[in-house]
């Protein structure tokens, strides 16, 4: 149960894709997983989700560069695991056409995601922890995954809000390009020490 939320992307999206081949059972499992995450990880105060279940505010997160504001009492998840909900909703809606996933995306997941949006630095993008906690690190790969999901979502909904946001995110992502280290996009804007596969080949 503890890492269920973080694993959502790796379980939910493949399940949705498999539903096209394997029938309704995979779609049902994907929906069950989504509903369980929403139920167990809910943080009503912010309309967001916890990093782990059960909540552990003193946990040590090992997948960030740790150059921004220190999150000493972590109330909600970082952007990377939360963005799995975006991927999940988009995949479920694309696969099933069920408007409950569109409603969930537009009315709950996207408004929650907007709390991570950073307007204090240019180009604007999503930062790793909600803006209400101050400035935090910004990752090119995290924003890339969201931009791809927004493009996919626009393709099936024709909602230009998501297309505009995807374009804005790609403006940010391309700002991370440098010819140093053999060329490519950095991983973390605030700690330009590596150019990982996740920030350079995520489209594939």
Task: Please describe what each predicted stretch is.
Residues 1-22:
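Bacterial Sec-dependent N-terminal signal peptides
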Residues 20-133, 160-183:
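Low-complexity, Ser/Thr/Pro/Gly-enriched N-terminal "stalk/linker" regions
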Residues 204:
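Conserved small/polar residues in nucleotide/adenosyl-binding loops
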Residues 75-82, 135-157, 197-200:
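Aromatic-rich carbohydrate-recognition surfaces in CAZymes
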Residues 6, 87, 144-146:
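Hydrophobic side chains within alpha-helical segments
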């Amino acid at each position: 149960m503890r890492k269920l939320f973080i694993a959502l992307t790796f379980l939910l999206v493949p399940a949705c894709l498999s539903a096209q081949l394997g029938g309704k059972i995979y779609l049902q499992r994907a929906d069950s997983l989504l509903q369980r995450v929403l139920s167990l990880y809910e943080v009503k105060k912010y309309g967001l989700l916890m990093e782990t279940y059960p909540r552990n505010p003193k946990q040590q997160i090992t997948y960030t560069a740790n150059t921004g504001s220190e999150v000493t009492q972590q109330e909600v998840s970082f952007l990377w695991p939360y963005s799995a909900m975006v991927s999940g909703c988009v995949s479920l809606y694309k696969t099933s056409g069920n408007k409950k996933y569109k409603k969930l995306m537009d009315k709950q997941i996207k408004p929650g995601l907007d709390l991570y949006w950073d307007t204090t630095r240019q180009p604007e993008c999503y930062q790793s922890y909600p803006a209400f906690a101050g400035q935090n690190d910004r990752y090119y790969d995290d924003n890339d995954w969201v931009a791809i999901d927004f493009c996919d979502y626009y393709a099936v909904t024709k909602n230009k809000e998501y297309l505009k946001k995807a374009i804005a995110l790609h403006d940010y992502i391309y700002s991370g390009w440098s010819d140093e280290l053999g060329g490519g996009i950095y991983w973390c804007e605030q700690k330009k020490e590596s150019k990982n596969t996740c920030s350079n080949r995520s489209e594939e």
